[in-house]
Every structure is written in structure tokens, then in C-alpha cells.
Amino acid sequence: MKAIIISIGDELLKGHRVNTNAPFIARELGNIGIPVTRIITCSDDPQAIRDSVTLALTEAEAVFVTGGLGPTNDDRTRDAVRALLGRGLALDEPSFERIADYFRRRNRPVTEVMKDQAMVIEGSIAIPNTKGTAPGMIIECAPRFAGRHLVLMPGVPAEMEAMMRLTVVPFFAPLSGAFIRHTPVMTMGIGETQLADMIVEVEDSLPSGTTLAYLPHAAGVSLMVSTSGARREDVDAENRRVVEAIVAKAGRFVYATSEVTLEEVVVNLLLERKLTVAVAESCTGGLLGSRLTDVPGSSGCFLEGLVTYSNQAKVRLLGVDPATIEAHGAVSEPVAKEMARGCLERSGADISVSTTGIAGPGGGTPEKPVGTVCVGIASKLPDGAVRVEAARFVMHGDRHQNKIRFSEAALRGLLVRLKEMEF
């Protein structure tokens, strides 16, 4: 079974909205072994909708449409499809009761417009909308498009996602005829080319039914290993074998084989070891602390964060020696080390990290170009002494990208030090 996704809405074509629905649907379908061969974006015009649906139904066994279901004048999908299939409308009583109850609980009258929302195309299966009002539909398109299924869902992401998870995926999973396993391999501190060179033997010997996708992002690159086949046990075993082969080749750069962020791994390790962390930031402007505290449960390990953007703040709040700044500059490994040590001593944390750098677009020099960052790490040793180290990196991006990459470098430093610490 192959699928095509159609995203309907003038707002998508005009660039007023980003289409997040199509990637979500593609991922959900991929998880049950249904590949997406095409994604179409079309306007709210009824003829454009009919043309897009006709094309899709001639090419794929399953077509998934989002957008154009609802009470407003630009919600034209249902009627366009009804006309294409030559069918009437029928009231779906459960949907109407759900809509009526939704408005009664808000002390609003039930109108004919609301009743119209509960009308579905004859012969369809109504998809309950647990996050809104307009129901979706699963339609068998015979006789004109025999053997084809058409799914209509609202364009509101929360409504569509609930329909996919609760109704659509369970409906189509038994029809896919295949099992599929996706396993992410999350890496840190390595570029796409270097990673590809490192695992070239694994990639050259991939078995039939297994693919490897490189997923570059602002902070680096990760991999997605996908395996499909007729027997779940074989699929799982083959997928696991390939993942293990990648980890064997690139292990020191791999921080997880599940979809977790680097900050989640760091926070979970801190919590597991009952350690606390504090951060002293300059060039990242609070981003590092924000990423750590985005992780649920981080209050159990994150003590405090200081944004010491100016040299005066570094001296006053962290105890950085003005002579160190004078001799080496604020963006230097000696300053990063003093920032990390000062943060550790003043916070009482078990480990601390500092960032000082040049995010750009100005401020760079030949010796310290834009994108330079120095990361300091300080941690307590079992004998009460303090271990302090710093490293310098040069990133290549705009100001926003550099700040993300700077924070990623700091998280990498934290993770490496945590794995080295003795207890």
C-alpha cells in the first residue's frame, strides 16, 4: 500500500502557515509500513481540490487530506469530494451530539451551522473529533476508484493528530501488509561527511529492506535506520543489527539510539547520579539554562544559571580576574575556566559549565573569527579538589545557529565529563 498526502489551504500556498501536518502524517504512516510517495499542497478552490484528489486516487491506494473541514466559507473539502464521488450527505448522530454538547457546555446555542458540520459523505466512516468539532471521514471510493481509501481530516494540527492516533492509524495498520521499524541514532560533535566516512562499510552492506537517512540539523546530524519486511521478528532483528553496527563504528559520537535530546540525556544522567549543575553563560545568553530546564524533572538537578554578558559581570558575579581578561580576552579558554570555577564555587553545584564566544555577525578577528566559542567545565573530585578544563570550537552559521551550536558544545562537554566522573 502506498499513500499520498494532500494539504489544502490558501494560507499554505501564500506562506502564511507552515505545513506541519504532512510530516506528522508521513511519520505515522511510516511507522505502520505505509510509504508516502507524494505530498500535494493545493488551494481552497473546489476544482483544485477535485483535481488533486483525482490525481492522488489514481496513483495511491490511500489518500490523506487535511484542511477545508469546518464551518467557514473556505471550508470546501467535503463538498468538493462529495461531488467528485457522486454521493450525498448524511447526518452522523454521534458527531452532532458531540458538537451540540461542546457548545451547550459553553452556554452557546446549537445552530444549523453546527448541524451542518456533523454531515458526512454517504458511505463514509465518521472519525470522532476529540479536540474540536468537525468530524473526519474514512471513505471507500468504489466504484469510481475501486480499492482506494480517502481520509478527510481538519487542518488544525491538534485535531488531525488525535484523529490519526486514535482512529486512522488503527484502521490502516492491518491493511499495510508490512512491518516497519525506525530507530534513530543520535550523534554529537561530528559532521555529516565525517560520519558517512566512518560508517561507509555499514552503509555499503545494508540489506534489502533497510535504508539509512541522514538528518542534519542546526546542532549536527543524526541518522534514521528504517527496516521493513513481512515478519515483525525479522524486521526487528535486522534493524537492531544495523544499529549495533553503526554504534560499533561511531560509538564515541553516539549519545542515544532513541529520539531524545542531548539535554534530556544530560539531565537524566544528573538525576540518576544525584548530581547538581549550574551554568555561567555569556554568548549563549541563557539558552543553555533554558534547554536544561526544558526537561521535565530538571528542578531535581539544576541549581542556578548566570548570564554574565559583560566583562564587569564576569568579574563581579563569577570572580573572573580582570588581568585574565586583559591578557587573553573575554573569549578565551582561561576566562572560560575561571567562569566555570567561579560558578561551581558560588553555586555549590557538583558540576558547572561556562560559555564565552562570538555569535556574530560582527566582533570577529583573524585570531578569533565569528563562531568562536570557549566552553569551560568544572567539577568536584572525590578528594574535594576541583577539576577545571576548557576547550575552544569554531562554528559556522548565523547568530541564531551559532548560539544553538554553542549550547550544544556545552551540553556535549557536560555529558563527557559526567561519564568520566568517579563516585
UniProtKB/Swiss-Prot annotation:
Domain of life: Bacteria
SUPFAM superfamilies: CinA-like, Molybdenum cofactor biosynthesis proteins
Entry-linked InterPro entries: CinA, CinA-like_C, CinA_C, CinA_KH, Competence-induced_CinA, MoaB/Mog-like_dom_sf, MoaB/Mog_dom
Record family assignment: Belongs to the CinA family.
PANTHER family, alphabetized: NICOTINAMIDE-NUCLEOTIDE AMIDOHYDROLASE PNCC (PTHR13939), NMN AMIDOHYDROLASE-LIKE PROTEIN YFAY (PTHR13939:SF0)
Name of the featured protein: CinA-like protein
